[in-house]
């Protein structure tokens, strides 16, 4: 299984804040396992920390603003996108003001610094949320929508549509996060000339200029109005009849605006709190719908906190019944594992098919057959035993004996025709032949029982 990652070392970036115009420095630091993303305002008394999760987003007008107990940090999305796309799970971010510096309006400097300091693998397993069915969020008032579909990896398709002759419908896609650096990171934020005066009047974009945003002039205005706006922006006067991009830097890609919207989607969905395996299809996305979708995903995750393993009956098993018989001393009717379909250093997934011919159904119960709970635990324990035996050389010469079982819960009946899917994982490294494990049994997507085990590996006499 993939492990969590953090930075090998800290790095800092400095620049103007897009909306405040303040000189700001943000520092990204390594963080321990299961820390997640946290942002610390080191300029305030007590240096308060905000969890970087969608539930703490309070404003989305022209960027993503996180708030907690009156403490705010804005314009976080580009830094968050870089962390998420490069697979960083745990990071403490310190900033000396109310927003991240805008830099050049893209995520490329974050990516460069992450690559410079490097990343390191941690002990904890990366906790993916696997999309198993379509999830959709629509905003009928704007025509925006975000859909996520099952997929083996995280990928995105983004469509933007504006009432503009300069930016027609644009499409951007990212099939693999490994391509984020080359295909997305350098895409810059953008603004329409018609939006600049209202934004300035609202006290925003005080640090905006042609070096940190693409500025698009697509609706003709009078030369006088255009000259006044140029004076406010601090740029030379230009011909009001000449529509188009007014930046002195050329576009990185013809569809740079769509690519930047894709970057923003990644940054906002990083606030879900877990990496996703699924394909995102976003139509006319923006920070508002991105955040609403991220909140919906957090609710989905809470509802399905324990996910059943994926079972593909066409894949070759890791262990078939014959190999299991070589490792476990159990025999009919007490060999209760049919096959192992997945196994890593710290986890295992096994299967027991429940048929009407099971001998225990003769007495439990003849008129309403139900698999005894103690046998469900026995089957789970056998799967865990296979995991533990996998940690030693010549496993055929060892047996596993269980010393303690705790936290047993039965949630649903198991009946003939069910397929029991077991997932057992180590809670700590095996020490001196002693292991502690947590196991879940599923029928379909539902947890039917769970338990914790302590076991000892003993060499056979």
UniProtKB/Swiss-Prot annotation:
Query: Which parts of the sequence are annotated with region: 3-hydroxyacyl-[acyl-carrier-protein] dehydratase?
Result: 303-461
Q: Which reaction does it catalyse?
A: a UDP-3-O-[(3R)-3-hydroxyacyl]-N-acetyl-alpha-D-glucosamine + H2O = a UDP-3-O-[(3R)-3-hydroxyacyl]-alpha-D-glucosamine + acetate; a (3R)-hydroxyacyl-[ACP] = a (2E)-enoyl-[ACP] + H2O
GO biological process terms on file: fatty acid biosynthetic process; lipid A biosynthetic process
Is the keyword Calcium assigned to this protein?
A: no
Name where it mostly resides: cytoplasm
Q: What is its EC number?
A: 3.5.1.108, 4.2.1.59
Catalytic residues (UniProt): 287 (proton donor), 364
Record-linked CDD domains: FabZ (cd01288)
Q: Which GO terms describe its molecular function?
A: (3R)-hydroxyacyl-[acyl-carrier-protein] dehydratase activity; metal ion binding; UDP-3-O-acyl-N-acetylglucosamine deacetylase activity
Q: Which domain of life is it from?
A: Bacteria
| Pathway assignment | Glycolipid biosynthesis; lipid IV(A) biosynthesis; lipid IV(A) from (3R)-3-hydroxytetradecanoyl-[acyl-carrier-protein] and UDP-N-acetyl-alpha-D-glucosamine: step 2/6
* Essential cofactor(s): Zn(2+)
Q: Where in the cell is it found?
A: Cytoplasm
Region feature UDP-3-O-acyl-N-acetylglucosamine deacetylase, mapped onto this chain? 1-302
Q: Please list the residues that bind Zn(2+).
A: 78, 260, 264
Instruction: Tell me the function of this protein.
Output: Catalyzes the hydrolysis of UDP-3-O-myristoyl-N-acetylglucosamine to form UDP-3-O-myristoylglucosamine and acetate, the committed step in lipid A biosynthesis.
In the record, the note on similarity to other proteins reads: In the N-terminal section; belongs to the LpxC family.
Q: Know the name of this protein?
A: Bifunctional enzyme LpxC/FabZ
The primary gene name is: lpxC/fabZ
């Amino acid at each position: 299984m993939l492990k969590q990652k953090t930075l090998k070392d800290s790095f800092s970036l400095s620049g103007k804040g897009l909306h405040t115009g303040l000189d700001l420095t943000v520092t990204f630091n390594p963080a321990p396992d299961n820390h997640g993303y946290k942002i610390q305002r080191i300029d305030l008394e007590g240096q308060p920390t905000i969890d970087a999760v969608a539930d703490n987003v309070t404003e989305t007008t022209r960027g993503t603003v996180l708030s907690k107990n009156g403490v705010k940090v804005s314009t976080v999305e580009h830094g968050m996108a870089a962390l998420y796309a490069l697979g960083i799970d745990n990071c403490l971010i310190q900033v000396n003001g109310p927003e991240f510096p805008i830099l050049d309006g893209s995520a490329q400097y974050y990516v460069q610094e992450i690559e410079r300091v490097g990343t390191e693998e941690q002990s904890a397993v990366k906790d993916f949320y696997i999309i198993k069915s379509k999830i959709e969020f629509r905003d009928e008032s704007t025509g925006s929508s975000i859909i996520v579909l099952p997929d083996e990896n995280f990928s995105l398709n983004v469509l933007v549509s504006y009432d503009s002759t300069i930016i027609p419908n644009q499409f951007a896609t990212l099939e693999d996060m490994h391509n984020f650096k080359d295909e997305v990171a350098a895409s810059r934020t953008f603004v329409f000339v018609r939006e600049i005066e209202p934004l300035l009047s609202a006290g925003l974009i005080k640090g905006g200029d042609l070096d940190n945003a693409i500025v698009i002039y697509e609706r003709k205005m009078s030369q006088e109005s255009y000259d006044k706006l140029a004076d406010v922006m601090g740029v030379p006067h230009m011909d009001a009849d000449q529509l188009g991009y007014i930046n002195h830097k050329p576009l990185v890609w013809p569809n740079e605006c769509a690519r930047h919207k894709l970057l923003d989607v990644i940054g906002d969905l990083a606030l879900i709190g877990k990496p996703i395996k699924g394909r995102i299809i976003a139509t006319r996305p923006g920070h508002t719908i991105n955040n609403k979708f991220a909140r919906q995903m957090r609710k989905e995750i809470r509802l399905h906190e324990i996910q059943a393993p994926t079972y593909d009956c066409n894949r070759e098993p890791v262990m078939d019944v014959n190999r299991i018989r070589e490792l476990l001393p159990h025999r009919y009717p007490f060999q209760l594992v049919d096959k192992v379909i997945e196994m890593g250093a710290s986890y295992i997934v096994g299967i027991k098919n429940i048929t009407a011919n099971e001998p225990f159904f003769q007495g439990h119960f003849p008129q309403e057959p139900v698999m005894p709970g103690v046998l469900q635990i026995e089957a789970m324990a056998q799967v865990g035993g296979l995991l533990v035996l996998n940690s030693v050389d010549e496993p055929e010469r060892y047996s596993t004996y269980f010393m303690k079982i705790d936290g047993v819960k039965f949630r649903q009946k198991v009946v003939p025709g069910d397929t029991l899917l077991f997932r057992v994982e180590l809670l700590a490294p095996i020490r001196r032949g002693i292991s502690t494990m947590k196991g879940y049994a599923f029928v379909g997507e539902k947890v039917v029982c769970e338990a914790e085990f302590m076991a000892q590996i003993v060499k056979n006499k």
